[in-house]
């Protein structure tokens, strides 16, 4: 869309100075996973600047309440019980807050699956979107006759919350898979 309509403007593409970040932090619901919880919580705690945290998982919520970090919600979302529908509801709240300027960036801290022997605490940048069309995409866009009805801005506004929901749900599923799978020492 950004390549096809160079005049497209969207709050999801803006590159402003990042003053406040919303961190979605996914940890386990129990403390039985050794480094699983501590690694992702250390990763989140290393985030620089002002943060607002959306904790997913009981250990995530307990950690940030104990450290008096501002929370996006007081509701405790159990990682093992988060549904696709809840992720879509969360994504609408996340994107609405982003559009209103309550925070300038959205990131997810979760445990990434590298292999059965290696899992890594990771931070994924979700918003603002980093979309730099290649020269080939720009050339193809100039040749194309794509006309957006509704406007490209309205299309962005409709699909980005869906995109964010998919990213959040994928990170929750990946983290929960690792949390519940047998460790190499089992």
Task: Pin down the residues of each PLM region.
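C-terminal beta-strand-loop-alpha-helix "lid" module of Rossmann-like NAD(P)-dependent dehydrogenases
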Residues: 1-181, 185
């Amino acid at each position: 869309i950004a390549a096809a309509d160079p005049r497209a403007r969207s709050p999801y593409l803006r590159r402003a100075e990042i003053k406040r970040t919303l961190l979605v932090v996914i940890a386990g619901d129990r403390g039985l996973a050794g480094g699983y919880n501590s690694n992702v919580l250390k990763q989140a705690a290393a985030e620089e600047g002002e943060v607002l945290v959306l904790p997913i998982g009981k250990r995530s919520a307990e950690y940030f309440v104990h450290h008096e970090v501002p929370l996006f919600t007081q509701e405790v979302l159990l990682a093992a019980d988060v549904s696709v529908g809840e992720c879509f509801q969360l994504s609408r709240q996340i994107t609405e807050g982003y559009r209103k300027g309550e925070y300038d960036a959205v990131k997810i801290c979760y445990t990434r699956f590298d292999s059965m022997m290696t899992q890594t605490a990771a931070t994924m940048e979700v918003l603002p979107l980093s979309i730099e069309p290649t020269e080939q995409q720009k050339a193809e866009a100039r040749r194309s006759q794509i006309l957006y009805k509704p406007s490209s801005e309205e299309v962005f506004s409709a699909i980005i919350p869906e995109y964010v929901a998919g990213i959040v749900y994928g990170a929750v599923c990946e983290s929960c898979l690792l949390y519940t799978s047998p460790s190499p020492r089992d």
